[in-house]
């Protein structure tokens, strides 16, 4: 039997919590259309694994273009375009949790979007993209955030290979 990961435990705890699950209809998140995150194992995601635990592929084994427009990547983008956000953990994603305030700039009401490129994506229901705007390389396990979705304090590498390099 496989031991559940910390991520599995957190997602189960959150699922059973009183954190509100907001309706995402009428909102658009640009993250899957503009952002990639690559961890030390080469796994690629569009955002934090605690917010969406779905990999698009692995750049160690797959061509970048294939990861960028993998079936999973396109399905995630489709779920944003149809308003379901079905791949997102609506209880851990701080962008979705910002809905009562009208979004956070990355997640916006569709009628508030001014970026023409994003408006074209929405209008044409584009799930394939030609390029990415931001790439975040997650080369070490340190984090300067005290994010309630995954930790209550900072994680700092103070010894070992990650610290020395």
Walk through the language-model features, giving the residues of each.
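Short, ordered coil/turn segments that flank beta-strands lining enzyme active or ligand-binding pockets
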Residues: 39-40
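Conserved alpha-helical substructure of the radical SAM core
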Residues: 56, 95-165
């Amino acid at each position: 039997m496989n031991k559940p990961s910390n991520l599995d435990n957190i997602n189960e705890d959150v699922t059973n919590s009183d954190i509100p699950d907001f309706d995402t209809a009428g909102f658009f998140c640009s993250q899957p259309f503009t952002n990639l995150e690559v961890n030390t194992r080469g796994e690629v995601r569009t955002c934090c694994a605690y917010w969406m635990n779905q990999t698009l592929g692995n750049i160690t084994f797959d061509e970048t273009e294939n990861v960028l427009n993998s079936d999973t990547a396109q399905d995630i983008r489709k779920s944003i375009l149809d308003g379901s956000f079905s791949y997102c953990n609506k209880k851990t994603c701080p962008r979705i949790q910002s809905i009562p305030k009208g979004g956070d700039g990355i997640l916006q009401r569709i009628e508030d979007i001014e970026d023409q490129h994003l408006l074209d994506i929405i209008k044409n229901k584009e799930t394939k993209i030609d390029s990415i705007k931001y790439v975040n390389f997650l080369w070490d396990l340190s984090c300067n955030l005290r994010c309630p979705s995954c930790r209550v304090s900072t994680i700092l590498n103070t010894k070992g290979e990650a610290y020395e390099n």
